[in-house]
């Protein structure tokens, strides 16, 4: 999941995977690029912009843009590069594979909203964030509500949370 879900997988042509470290990104890049029949990602171009994963001759942003323009499907691996201050309009999903419940909500939301950039070539009907740590997700949402509300009134918090979830629904898939 979610690549095993045919409906979702059609929307996941260009994705950002937020990794816990450079070594993890390097190892995952190697696994994702194995050209075996068992590898469901063998048709993806993998761009590792974590640490020394990117070539020194091009910027990480240019490397990703070039890969996207030359490939139907890409996976970008990052430990932080390209997660703030830039937009890759073609990204339709972010996979949060790093962080903890202590991950700051500002950094968390800066990263996950990378996939919400407008896209002129193909209008995005949907974009996704996949985070397999419900504690991290719910902690970030709680921090966001607390930081954007001047009161601790329970009803006001519920109203703010309801508004937030209208624009950023949070779902759980059990038994994935």
What are these regions (language model features)?
Residues 1-51:
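Conserved helicase/translocase motor-coupling segment
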Residues 21, 104-106, 173-176:
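Intrinsic-disorder/low-complexity, polar/charged segments
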Residues 32-35, 115, 148, 168:
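Alpha-helix boundary/capping residues
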Residues 40-41, 45-155:
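Conserved RecA-like P-loop NTPase helicase motor core
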